[in-house]
Amino acid sequence: MLLCCVLTAVALAGCGNPQAAGADTVEDSRTVEGEENPGNSENAEGETPEGSGDQAEQPGNGGSEETESSQEEVQEVEITMKDVAPMDLVKEMKIGWNLGNTLDATSKSIGVNVEMAWGNPRTTQEMIDAIIDQGFNVIRIPVSWGGQMGKAPAYNVLPAWMDRVQEVVDYAYGRGVYVIVNIHHEDWHFPSEENKDAAAEQLAALWTAIATRFRDYDEHLIFEGMNEPRKIGTSVEWNDGDKEGRDVVNYLDQVFVEAVRATGGNNTIRNLMVPGYAASSSDTALKSIVLPQDEHLIVSVHAYTPYNFALNKEGKSTWDNDTRDIDHLMELLDELFLSKGVPVIIGEFGAMNKDNEDERVQWARYYVSKAREYGVPCVWWDNNAFDGDGENFGLLNRRELTFPYPELLKALIESAE
């Protein structure tokens, strides 16, 4: 097996020490760690840009003690969930929502309080309920882990962070919707030949810990191996990348799948999402995807398209019924994956607010309806940003629990039916 050496090292790992608390506030949207201007993190065509409440008892709620043993040597664990084919699973999904700029925020100085580092409030059951009650049945929870992990070779996850992630997952999982957990702003898996082995070791360690903690959850929980794996800070960061980067991402997808499967139990048949380079919707990136050998895979794609309307802050505020890019994307996804029995989830999409709700409504109706025709569920990127100079993809006002754009919300829900 590809991971025989990597997983042997992982099996011996425990959990690390909490980081020192501090203060760090960064404003705005789909930020990538290390950028000087967080609000302008995504500029490529089509790609990215205190908890309370009653909840059902969840599997795996073992607290810190369980996390500390989450990387113990793998042993046989009973499978307790239905074996659902990925195409059948995705057919049950309608429309989704991202808890953006929250657990995916990055800081190396404030520990678990990083959830609020980018200006968003602490996630609550009420927030998740507000979304689900509108008709969303997929909740994607982006999580950044690098600042909550120890050093090699153990890469221990901070127990309090794992506990908090599980708490937020349970807010949605307890409502019976589909939940996607990923690893988000991680610069350590830079996809180069030079970094490939180190990235594989850390990726396997991290996913062994995550998968072990959530092993008893049923088919409603989906793992997404990486967010937008790419060569950050280089001339080939976005869109197609380069051949080396695309090949290494394919390799790391295989590492992710093998690490999860090795934890046993429900994870042997859990449906997993894998991206291509940068999760790009470009032709070259999609055509370069080589899927791992596995029967429970879903392709992950991000598509803020057409770019000049949806993602480019300096672009158009009118849609003008420009369906070409959307149509081409769906046709390509069908050719490469859907027609071959491999489902696709558009894990991030959206059109930023340019004081143009009517235009966004028309665009959303077409985009989601077209995706629905092909059986592709779409997950709106919501960073809780509504005005200012940044990327304003807010849908739910999380402080007031209101929806400032009711017609856009209606268009998303109705078009997914």
Where are these regions (language model features)?
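Ser/Thr/Gly/Pro-rich low-complexity, disordered linker/stalk segments of secreted
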Residues: 23-75
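C-terminal motif of bacterial Sec signal peptides marking the signal peptidase cleavage site
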Residues: 11-14
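Active-site region of glycoside hydrolase catalytic domains
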Residues: 201-316, 331-352, 373-374
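N-terminal carbohydrate-binding accessory modules
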Residues: 60-138
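An active-site-proximal structural segment forming one wall of the substrate-binding cleft
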Residues: 119-138, 154-184, 191-225, 248-263
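Bacterial signal peptide processing site
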Residues: 16-18
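Acidic/histidine-rich helix-loop elements
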Residues: 99-123, 151-157, 195, 308-326, ...
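Substrate-binding cleft of secreted/luminal carbohydrate-active enzymes
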Residues: 327-404
